[in-house]
């Protein structure tokens, strides 16, 4: 059965990006199923309005409760997944969160816009996620990378599992450097060890690079990583 994702949004066309590349192939193979639902289709306002002025005054407009609730109710008739809202008050998204959500079978994403949503909408939301301490023009901008990050962990989307098992963050470290042809470009050479064909030495070189890059660039991640005796030797090795 395909992994199902329903996205409630005011701008369905923004998600056409999923029709391309790896995600597009996963959709064609029915590994994942991504549906967009236009919240505007559920408004009872004769002018198709989905927002209104905030009580108490203030700048901007607030997304109305009625079309959000009614669109959620319609989707939940066939999708029993968690309802996830993309907003700045949410828990910061991480690779660990992506792994946990990829274990689900169905998910529902709600994309906010304008100044936000009517606070009463939170009674219908299971989880709020933020991309970080910055503001975007709409939840769609946050939803796209989050959905992509989750879907690429679903078996079959990337092909071989090794494709993501060796990537940054999968084991809590940043990824090692990559090289391809030519072997020498204007004096910039590929490390000789990668041309040696010695798989164990290549593995150790990559792990060493991964450890050292993480320690230098993301000390916060490095502190959380449990070093093995081999890791300690690799960290102290000269290259």
From Swiss-Prot:
This is tRNA (guanine-N(1)-)-methyltransferase. HAMAP family: TrmD. It is an enzyme of class 2 (transferase). GO terms for biological process: tRNA N1-guanine methylation. The keyword S-adenosyl-L-methionine applies. Belongs to the RNA methyltransferase TrmD family. It catalyses: guanosine(37) in tRNA + S-adenosyl-L-methionine = N(1)-methylguanosine(37) in tRNA + S-adenosyl-L-homocysteine + H(+). GO terms for molecular function: tRNA (guanine(37)-N1)-methyltransferase activity. It comes from Clostridium tetani (strain Massachusetts / E88). The lineage of its organism: Bacteria, Bacillati, Bacillota, Clostridia, Eubacteriales. Keywords: Cytoplasm, Methyltransferase, S-adenosyl-L-methionine, Transferase, tRNA processing. It is found in: Cytoplasm. Specifically methylates guanosine-37 in various tRNAs. Homodimer. Its EC number is 2.1.1.228. The keyword Cytoplasm applies. GO terms for cellular component: cytosol. S-adenosyl-L-methionine binds at residues 112, 131-136.
């Amino acid at each position: 059965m395909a992994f199902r994702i329903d996205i409630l949004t005011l701008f369905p066309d923004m998600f056409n990006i999923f029709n391309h590349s790896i995600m597009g192939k996963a959709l064609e193979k029915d590994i994942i199923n991504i549906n967009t639902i236009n919240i505007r289709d559920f408004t009872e306002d004769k002018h198709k309005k989905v927002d209104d002025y905030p009580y108490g005054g203030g700048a901007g407009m607030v997304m109305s409760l009625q079309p959000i609730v009614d669109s959620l109710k319609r989707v939940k008739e066939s999708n029993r997944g968690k309802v996830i809202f993309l907003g700045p008050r949410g828990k910061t998204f991480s690779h660990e969160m992506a792994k946990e959500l990829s274990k689900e079978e169905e998910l529902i994403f709600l994309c906010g816009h304008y100044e936000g949503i009517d606070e009463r909408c939170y009674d219908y939301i299971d989880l709020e996620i933020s991309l970080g301490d910055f503001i975007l023009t709409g939840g769609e901008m946050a939803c796209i990378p989050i959905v992509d990050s989750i879907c690429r962990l679903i078996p079959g989307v990337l092909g071989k599992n090794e494709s993501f098992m060796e990537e940054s963050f999968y084991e809590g470290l940043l990824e090692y450097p990559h090289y391809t042809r030519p072997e020498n470009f204007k004096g910039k050479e590929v490390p000789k060890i990668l041309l040696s064909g010695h798989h164990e030495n290549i593995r150790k070189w990559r792990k060493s690079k991964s450890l050292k890059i993480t320690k230098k660039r993301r000390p916060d991640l490095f502190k959380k990583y449990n070093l093995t005796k081999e890791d300690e030797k690799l960290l102290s090795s000269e290259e």
